[in-house]
């Protein structure tokens, strides 16, 4: 959408230019100043406008920036972002003063939002996976009373699909408050997408959620965060329980290896992988030395996992000597497994070719 006035267009052009400190006074006079720093515009790979400052260095989508400006009762930026094309109705999600609500009305906002609109705005806002945006989403939504008006089952479904690989998705429990559910949700998103600044923010603000962070790191194969939170000594979990959590999601080679290097039982890891029909994990466990083949085969038979039974019927599996050094440096683990293909899966592939 084009800016509604020549002045707004001029400001938009100015905000996209490379600037020096000599230009700061001009930017202040033009209202291109936010959080005691210059306000800049750029576009992401999807051609969406992003508002940036040195604090919001990853940028916010224009509608999200509007919500932040409304929360701060920053009239100048509310009007500017609206002229640049922001949907003023987004501001109704964060308005906290009546005179700011009146300004939003003057700029075209509705009297109130329907429950479906609240959920739609929530869905669109959370899609931008950066530290700046996830932290702001937490600030805007986790204690937002408007979210109590939405269809809670729909909200939980959104959360479920974003965190569906979490091993124990306890945040969807009916006994969990909306605020706690959303706080854990944003924390989980930060760990899943390796948003370092957001992870550190939640770690400092919510020390009581350290076990949740560990759970997320194991579930989402984030070996770097797993190493960091495990080494703090602020959360304890049995190593075999850690391995169990890592094995519930397939292809979690990084966190499975890390738990293996710490001494977790690799045969139990193989059993967990089979119970969850995670074939890639199963072969990786054999690469790491799991040798309870007959027990695993019996378990697969109990579950009627016929393909796994057939896989375990071959006898030529053996550990991969390349993997048994038990290193715990996450960088080295990541390098070692970056393009790893299971030795035993290759063996199975070869035997299948010969068999058929």
UniProtKB/Swiss-Prot annotation:
ANK repeats lie at residues 61-93. Induction: Expressed in the early phase of the viral replicative cycle. It comes from the Viruses. InterPro entries: ASFV_MGF360 (IPR002595). Keywords: ANK repeat, Early protein. GO terms for biological process: taxis. Belongs to the asfivirus MGF 360 family. Plays a role in virus cell tropism, and may be required for efficient virus replication in macrophages. This is Protein MGF 360-19R. It comes from African swine fever virus (isolate Pig/Kenya/KEN-50/1950).
């Amino acid at each position: 959408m084009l800016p509604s006035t020549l002045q707004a267009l001029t400001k938009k052009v100015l905000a996209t230019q490379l600037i020096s400190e000599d230009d700061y006074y001009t930017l202040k006079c033009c209202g291109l100043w936010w959080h005691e720093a210059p306000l800049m515009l750029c576009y992401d790979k999807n051609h969406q406008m992003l508002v940036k400052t040195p604090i919001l260095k990853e940028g916010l989508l224009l509608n999200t920036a509007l919500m932040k400006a409304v929360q701060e009762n920053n009239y100048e930026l509310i009007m500017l972002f609206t002229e640049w094309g922001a949907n003023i109705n987004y501001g109704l999600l964060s308005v906290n003063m009546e005179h700011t609500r009146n300004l939003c009305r003057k700029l075209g906002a509705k009297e109130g939002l329907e429950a479906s609109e609240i959920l739609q705005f929530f869905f669109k806002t959370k899609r931008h996976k950066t530290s700046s945006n996830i932290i702001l989403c937490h600030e805007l939504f986790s204690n937002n009373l408007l979210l109590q008006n939405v269809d809670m089952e729909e909200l939980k479904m959104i959360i479920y699909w974003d965190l569906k690989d979490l091993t124990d998705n306890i945040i969807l429990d009916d006994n969990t408050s909306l605020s706690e559910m959303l706080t854990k949700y944003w924390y989980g998103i930060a760990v899943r997408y390796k948003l370092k600044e957001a992870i550190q923010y939640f770690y400092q603000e919510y020390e009581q959620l350290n076990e949740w962070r560990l759970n997320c790191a194991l579930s989402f194969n984030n070996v770097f965060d797993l190493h960091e939170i495990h080494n703090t000594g602020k959360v304890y979990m049995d190593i075999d329980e850690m391995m169990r959590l890592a094995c519930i999601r397939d292809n979690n080679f990084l966190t499975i290896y890390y738990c293996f290097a710490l001494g977790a039982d690799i045969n139990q890891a193989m059993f967990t992988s089979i119970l969850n029909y995670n074939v890639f994990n199963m072969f990786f466990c054999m690469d790491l030395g799991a040798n309870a083949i007959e027990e695993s085969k019996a378990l697969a038979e109990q579950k009627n996992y016929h393909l796994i039974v057939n896989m375990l019927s071959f006898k030529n599996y053996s550990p991969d000597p390349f993997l048994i050094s038990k290193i715990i440096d996450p960088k080295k683990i990541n390098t070692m497994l970056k393009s790893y293909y299971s030795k035993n899966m290759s063996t199975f592939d070869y035997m299948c070719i010969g068999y058929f």
